[in-house]
């Protein structure tokens, strides 16, 4: 078991496979640092390996909302699994700005990664080029990936059931914030969400 692990994602929107990914990381270390990527427009950049990931329509939630989602979901899951709720923290992680990582995450941690496309391979190359210790938790083809946030957002846009694809805490918050309505209106998240 590693002392400290770093795991990351956009979580736009947080779904059941995100939770499985986060819990897999939590089982591999004593303390988990969850980096939320694309924290704001200034720290978000397109990457040729996945050009759509920086598009505003693919990043509807603010960092604050995603931090609340990740925290609520992990607290709920940790309680259900008998894990220490003090064994994780959540930070911004400007994934496209590796020169800034040291300001956000411990560079001597193990960086957990799932790979299923060119973007995952690009991140592995980026992390290893920085001399980071990388542990690939899963390396599968795109069609074996499973659930995607794009699919969940699409269901929200079309008014189809989506709640069963998200952890209960995430569904509660996204309903409270009317994320489906916000997506249908084509708007970004409200800055006034508590």
Language-model features and meaning:
Residues 1-194:
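Nucleotidyltransferase catalytic core that binds NTPs
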């Amino acid at each position: 078991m590693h002392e400290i692990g770093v795991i990351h994602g956009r979580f736009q929107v947080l779904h059941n496979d995100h939770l499985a990914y986060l819990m897999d990381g939590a089982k591999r270390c004593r303390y988990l640092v969850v980096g939320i990527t694309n924290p704001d427009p200034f720290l978000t950049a397109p990457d040729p390996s996945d050009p759509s990931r920086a598009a505003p329509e693919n990043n509807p939630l603010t960092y604050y909302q995603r931090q609340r989602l990740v925290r609520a979901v992990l607290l709920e899951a940790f309680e259900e699994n008998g894990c220490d709720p003090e064994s994780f923290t959540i930070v911004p992680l400007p994934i496209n700005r590796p020169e800034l990582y040291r300001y956000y995450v411990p560079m001597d941690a193990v960086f957990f990664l799932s790979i299923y496309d060119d973007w995952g391979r690009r991140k592995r190359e980026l992390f290893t080029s920085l001399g980071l210790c990388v542990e690939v938790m899963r390396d599968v083809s795109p069609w074996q990936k499973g659930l995607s946030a794009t699919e969940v957002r699409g269901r929200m846009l079309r008014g189809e059931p989506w709640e069963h694809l998200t952890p209960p805490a995430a569904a509660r918050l996204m309903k409270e914030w009317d994320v489906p309505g916000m997506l249908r209106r084509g708007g970004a998240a409200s800055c006034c969400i508590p």
